[in-house]
Amino acid sequence: MPPRRAASPAARAPEAVAEAVAEVVADAEVVVAVAVAGGVARRRAAPTRAAAFLAALTVSALGLGALGAGPAAARPAASDPAAPTAVTRAALDPALAEGRGARVDFAEQEAENAVTTGTLIGPDRTAYSLPAEASGRKAVRLVPGQYVEFTLPAAADAITVRYSLPDAPAGGGITAPLDVTVNGKNRRSMTLTSQYSWLYNQYPFSNDPQADLLHPDWWITECACVPAATTPAPVIAKPFRPTHMYDEQRLLLGRTYRAGDTIRLTVPAGSPAAWTVIDLLDSQRVGAPHVEAAAANALLFGADPTGRRDSADAIDRAIAFAKRHRLPVYLPPGTYQVNRHIIVDGVTITGAGSWYTTVKGKGVGFYGKEAADGGSRGVHLSRFAIEGDVRERVDTDQVNGVGGAMSDSTIDSLHIHHTKVGLWFDGPMSNVKVTRNVITDQIADGLNFHTGVTDSLVQDNFVRNTGDDGLAMWAEKTTNARNTFDHNTVQSPTLANGIAIYGGADTTVSANLVADPVREGSALHVGSRFGAEPFTGSLRVEGNTTVRSGTYELNWNIGLGAIWFYALDRNIDQADIQVTGNSFLDNTYNAIMLVSDWPVKDKVRIENVHFKDIRVDGTGTSVVSARVAGSASFENVDARGVGAVGVNNCGSFNFPATGSEFSLADRGGNDGGGTTGPWFAGWELPNTITCDDRPPVVAPPAPSPW
């Protein structure tokens, strides 16, 4: 346990702190006036007198936002500590994902593994159900008076609770309390909400559970018809296609608790929520706030850490001052109301840590300049939270956490919550590094590299509950090149894919962990769609683990693969595509799919795809589903628990006497199988037609060590 800190300004009475901050803000007016008048000399080697003044006051102003946290103090160890609730990663035994996914500071514990008086829901992977959107596809349902209790696996002073509440009858959500106790005492209350959950209907979705179909002229699988063209008109049950059911909330516990201490989450009697579903608990040791002493402290420029007044202009003033004096901007602990974009260029902004510094509001975002205006360079954002207020999907709205064009920039250790997209970059731009961020509860994507993003890295990010692709590269009109997604974790995207690559050159997707995609997508996706430029150079998909993917595609009424290649706009045949060292675990349908769409089935092909050193642990149907013309090679692809024929080869659905239009090349070492024998049997090669659109689905066993 680290030593307790000496008493800081945070320990003073609130009135004394308020007086100190008032003095600081008053002095800041003088500092800003001097800076504007040009009376502060610029020095490269050392800060100016005004900058030193700001630095000296930074520490004294630090305490305001930390008042609620209290000092860290561990309780004495229990004489007989309880066995800890199992720690998982994406609801997996961590050994099955070792070396893959984001390296995070928290321990994940699933509610279904905890002690509870509630009811287990799931397992179920059927879209539009509460279990389907839960991590591991199970959760615990509580009614008032019931609880779920977790035993801490390690010291912790902070928790994150992932939960679901009912919607209001007419939409818009409700709020309800959740009591948190540690070792049966120290009760705190969280106010949960479903105001950011519950979308319905067809794209781009609605918040109204009683809304009629948004697109009655679209074919829907529920009636296997186009409702507007069907007589008699089908009766469509309401609410239609409920989704995006979960949210999460964080809580500082006020002190450090030890491994073996118990965290109990109780729905109090009289709760307005008929039920509360708890999916999981993340626990961690946050520690003390970060202090940036030699910085332009935003408090000194009028920023309000209580969140009552808008701080956007004050932050702009701090940025302008910092750029003139070659200083970073520091956002001390607190909540800062910002209801527009903060435009950043050539500036470093750091907070006290994402648990202590929050920038919150309608339309809040940190944006680089538009690429057409030259874009921004040298932007460095770190150690704060961005809390948006986005409740509906409007694709033209620029309400993303981070946006614009930012070359030679870094985005590190942010927590981005309730924005439309966590980070959406519109290039051309180059050399941005996005690392160690937590991106949750987004209406659309977690991150998107859109249009001409090059030489950039996304690493060690944790993404959960997005409403579209978790991480995406979209090479629309101008190609992306030499970008890498490495060691990220993506869990429970409610629509589309965990990681999606739409065109581009020399791309790497490596050592990621992707779990529980829900519908109209899967874990890993390579697609020539949405007007993307062709794949060229190389595409390397290496050392990733997926679990509980290979989802049902409701528009096609078939199952996808954990990794799926989709040729729609053009061929996928110019790049050298290497899919190497991946593990596809507990696949609902297939492990691998290569597919086109019916209107273009005789116009497009997929070629130059090579699968090597792959492990497939359980498929509901096949290892490979081929529904396109082309070819692929396979080497050392080992499979077990295969639920149907190993290769479901439909080709382009012309069924010529010469065999399928898709061929599989055997490079040796393809072992294992399942219900029909060896998955890569000689009789299937190179292009035997084995097409079965809807074979019986055999639920695979839980993944286990190979």
Regions of interest found by a model, annotated:
Residues 2-10, 15-17, 23-77:
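Secretory targeting and sorting signals
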Residues 75, 80-291:
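Extracytoplasmic
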Residues 143-145, 304, 326-335, 351-357, ...:
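Extracellular beta-strand-rich, repetitive "passenger/adhesive" scaffolds
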Residues 298-330:
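Acidic Gly/Asp/Thr-rich repetitive segments characteristic of extracellular carbohydrate-active
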Residues 316, 320-321, 336-350, 358-383, ...:
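Extracellular beta-strand-rich solenoid/capping regions of secreted or surface-exposed proteins
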Residues 338-341, 353-354, 358-364, 389-396, ...:
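Short glycine/acidic-rich loop motifs that flank beta-strands on beta-rich extracellular proteins
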Residues 352-355, 377-388, 407-418, 429-445, ...:
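Right-handed parallel beta-helix
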Residues 622-691:
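Leucine-rich solenoid repeat scaffolds
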